């Protein structure tokens, strides 16, 4: 695709500095851009523009006034990120589905209910009493087990499994190989054998939730495991049975949440956070990468480390730990001085006794 810079200025309502007939063929980040690219910089004042990029054109904040080398055409906008996303969308139009409607190579149970404009790809399997909302898209290899429901305009990518009686809301995205509603990891070991405990609950995923590839969300024992509206879940996240995840949480890659954890709204868990069972995480809390959370977390708290503690406390511990070798040397030196002083004192006391 080839687009004139003047057309991009019109698209973004930006101010153009430079050649309006400049031809742009692609969008690129600063470090990989070439003479066919348009790129962007949200903080251009931090860059040396003689070396920052080989792009032909740059999207910059409207407030930025420093002149760039003449080789750059410039597009000045109010919101750099939003403008560049609009330009990128122009160069990367969505591909049309390779299938439309219900493939005759998909299995759809006679008792299933399909909304208008549903797309079901070959080799998908739709079980008894399943309900699929209007405009939903199910790719190849998807399995929706009996009694489950998929909301309107939800996209389910290949090889996703939604177990029986689970509910997926509208406008959700389920990426490849995620599993919704597997049995929770609960066992009765009183007999000496590990006997699977009751797993009669379900999973309820509210609207506008995104679930990453290979993520797993277990069904509740008697009630539903709940994922709140607008929550975004990264790849390889594991959420155990009976959890209640609030609205608009961000759960980054490889987070593991044990059973019956409750989170408030707008909680952020960075990569590889681990949360023990039956804890409460308050709204707006941030759990730093690889935090091992062993106690309840208040709303708005920022915690890090293993075991996780408030960020400032953990930083003090890390500073002290970094100084530990030096501190050990000082302690050894002080101990040696003390021993020498005590020896001298003993010698003086012995001499004084002899004189008496």
Language model features: what each stretch is:
Residues 40, 101-310, 315:
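Structural signal for interior beta-strand "rungs" in well-ordered beta-sheet cores
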Residues 1-105, 117, 166, 171, ...:
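Terminal amphipathic alpha-helical/low-complexity segments used for targeting or macromolecular assembly
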């Amino acid at each position: 695709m080839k687009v004139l810079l003047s057309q991009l200025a019109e698209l973004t309502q930006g101010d153009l500095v430079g050649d309006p007939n400049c031809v742009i063929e692609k969008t690129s980040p600063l470090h990989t851009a070439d003479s066919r690219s348009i790129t962007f910089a949200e903080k251009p004042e931090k860059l040396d523009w003689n070396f920052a990029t080989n792009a032909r054109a740059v999207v910059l904040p409207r407030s930025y006034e420093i002149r760039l080398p003449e080789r750059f055409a410039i597009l000045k906008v109010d919101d750099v990120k939003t403008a560049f996303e609009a330009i990128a969308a122009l160069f990367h139009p969505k591909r049309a589905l390779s299938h439309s409607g219900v493939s005759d190579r998909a299995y759809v149970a006679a008792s299933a209910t399909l909304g208008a404009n549903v797309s079901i790809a070959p080799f998908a399997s739709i079980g008894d009493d399943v309900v699929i909302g209007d405009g939903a898209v199910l790719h190849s290899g998807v399995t929706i087990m009996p009694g489950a429901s998929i909301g309107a305009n939800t996209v389910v990518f290949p090889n996703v499994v939604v177990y029986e009686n689970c509910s997926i809301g509208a406008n959700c995205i389920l990426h490849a190989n995620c599993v919704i509603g597997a049995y929770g990891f609960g066992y009765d070991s009183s007999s000496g054998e590990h006997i699977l405990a009751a797993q009669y609950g379900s999973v309820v995923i509210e609207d506008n939730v995104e679930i990453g590839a290979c993520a797993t969300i277990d069904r509740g024992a008697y009630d539903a495991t709940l994922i709140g509206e607008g929550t975004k879940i990264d790849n390889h996240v594991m959420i155990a049975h009976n959890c209640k995840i609030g609205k608009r949480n961000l759960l980054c890659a490889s987070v593991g949440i044990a059973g019956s954890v409750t989170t408030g709204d707008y909680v952020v868990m960075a990569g590889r956070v681990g949360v023990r069972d039956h804890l409460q995480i308050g709204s707006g809390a941030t759990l730093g990468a690889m935090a091992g959370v062993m106690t309840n977390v208040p709303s708005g708290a920022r915690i890090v480390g293993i075991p996780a503690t408030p960020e400032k406390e953990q930083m003090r511990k890390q500073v002290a730990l970094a100084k530990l070798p030096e501190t050990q040397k000082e302690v050894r030196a002080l101990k040696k001085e003390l021993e020498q002083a005590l020896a001298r004192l003993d010698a003086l006391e012995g001499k004084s006794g002899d004189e008496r």
